[in-house]
C-alpha cells in the first residue's frame, strides 16, 4: 500500500508539472520502483537535447551502501559504485554528498530518453526509478549562429598530436555548453588516459579545450572534430612516418612524424 501511495504522489507531481496525462511508458517505469520510503529525488527529468542531464539517487544516511545504475531499454549496467561500465564516455557517476549519487550524462541525445533504475544494495534491495525525457532542441536563429564560432587547430609536439578547440560567443552572459570530440563521427573515449589527455579552460564567452593524442602513429589518422551546439570545426589528421638523417658523417636513423592538416568549418 505504501509503494502504491508513493507512485501516486510521483504521478501527481508529474501531472501538475506537465499539465497533461503521464504516458504509459512513464507509468511503467515508475512502477518498477521498490522502496519502503518515498523517493526523495526527482523521478522525472526533462532536458533539452545537447544539454547535460543529472539523475539523482539517495541512499539511507549514515550507511555505506553502493548503488548501481542500469538502463531498462537494453538492461545495460552503466555504473556500479564509482566505476563506469559503459563504453559511452558521456556517462559518468559522481557522489554529490554522503548519501546522494548522481548519474551524469554529459550531452543528452533524444535516443537517451527512457527509464533508468538506481539499485541500492541495502537489506531491502531498494530500487528507485527515474524517467529521462530528452526534448528536441529548438531550431537556432540565424542571429544566434552569427554570435558563435568554433575553431580547431592542430600541430605536433614531439610524438603527440595537439588539437586546440576554441568556442567563442559574442554574448558574454551566455553559458557555453560542453564541447563534444569525435573521430570519424565516433565520440572519443577520454577514459582512455593512456591515449588521450583533455584539458579545459573557460572564460567569459570563451572555452578552449586542448586534446593531446599520445604516441601518435598512422593508426591515429582520421577526421577529428569538436562540436558545440549547431556548429562543428573539423580537421583531417594524417600522420606520416619518415626517416631522418643527421648532417654528420655518421648517420643515425630515427623516426619523425609530419602531420598534414585540412580544416573546414561546418554549420550543421
From Swiss-Prot:
PROSITE patterns: IG_LIKE (PS50835)
Disulfide bonds: 57-118, 165-226
A biological-process GO annotation: synapse organization
Gene3D superfamilies: Immunoglobulins
Entry keyword Magnesium: no
Keyword annotations: Disulfide bond, Glycoprotein, Immunoglobulin domain, Repeat, Secreted, Signal
Disruption phenotype: No visible phenotype. In a zig-5 mutant background, 74 percent of animals have cell bodies of ASI and ASH head neurons displaced either on the top of or anterior to the nerve ring. In addition, double mutants show defects in the positioning of the ventral nerve cord (VNC) axons characterized by axons of embryonically generated PVQ, PVP and HSN neurons from the left and right VNC drifting into the opposite cord (axon flip-over). Both defects begin at the L3 larval stage and become more pronounced at the L4 larval and adult stages.
Secretion signal span: 1-21
Cellular compartments per GO CC: extracellular region; neuron projection membrane
Name of this chain's protein: Zwei Ig domain protein zig-8
Source species of the chain: Caenorhabditis elegans
Lineage start: Eukaryota, Metazoa, Ecdysozoa, Nematoda, Chromadorea
Gene designation per UniProt: zig-8
Amino acid at each position: 500500500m505504501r509503494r502504491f501511495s508513493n507512485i501516486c504522489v510521483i504521478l501527481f507531481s508529474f501531472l501538475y508539472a506537465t499539465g497533461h496525462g503521464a504516458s504509459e511508458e512513464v507509468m511503467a517505469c515508475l512502477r518498477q520502483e521498490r522502496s519502503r520510503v518515498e523517493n526523495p529525488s526527482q523521478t522525472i527529468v526533462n532536458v533539452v537535447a545537447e544539454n547535460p542531464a543529472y539523475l539523482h539517487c539517495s541512499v539511507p544516511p549514515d550507511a555505506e551502501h553502493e548503488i548501481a545504475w542500469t538502463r531498462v531499454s537494453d538492461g545495460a549496467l552503466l555504473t556500479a559504485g564509482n566505476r563506469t561500465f559503459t563504453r559511452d564516455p558521456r556517462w559518468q557517476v559522481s557522489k554529490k554528498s554522503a548519501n546522494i549519487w548522481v548519474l551524469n550524462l554529459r550531452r543528452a541525445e533524444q535516443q537517451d530518453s527512457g527509464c533508468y533504475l538506481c539499485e541500492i544494495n541495502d537489506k531491502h534491495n531498494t530500487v528507485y526509478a527515474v524517467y529521462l525525457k530528452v526534448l528536441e532542441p529548438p531550431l537556432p536563429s540565424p542571429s544566434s549562429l552569427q554570435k558563435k564560432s568554433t575553431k580547431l587547430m592542430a600541430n605536433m609536439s614531439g610524438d603527440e598530436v595537439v588539437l586546440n578547440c576554441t568556442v567563442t560567443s559574442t554574448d558574454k552572459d551566455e553559458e557555453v555548453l560542453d564541447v563534444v570530440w569525435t573521430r570519424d563521427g565516433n565520440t572519443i573515449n577520454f577514459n582512455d588516459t593512456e591515449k588521450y589527455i583533455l584539458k579545459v579552460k573557460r572564460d567569459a564567452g570563451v572555452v578552449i579545450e586542448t586534446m593531446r593524442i599520445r604516441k601518435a602513429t598512422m593508426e591515429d589518422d582520421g577526421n577529428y572534430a569538436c562540436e558545440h551546439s549547431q556548429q562543428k570545426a573539423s580537421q583531417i589528421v594524417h600522420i606520416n612516418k619518415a626517416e631522418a638523417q643527421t648532417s654528420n658523417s655518421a648517420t643515425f636513423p630515427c623516426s619523425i612524424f609530419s602531420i598534414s592538416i585540412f580544416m573546414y568549418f561546418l554549420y550543421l
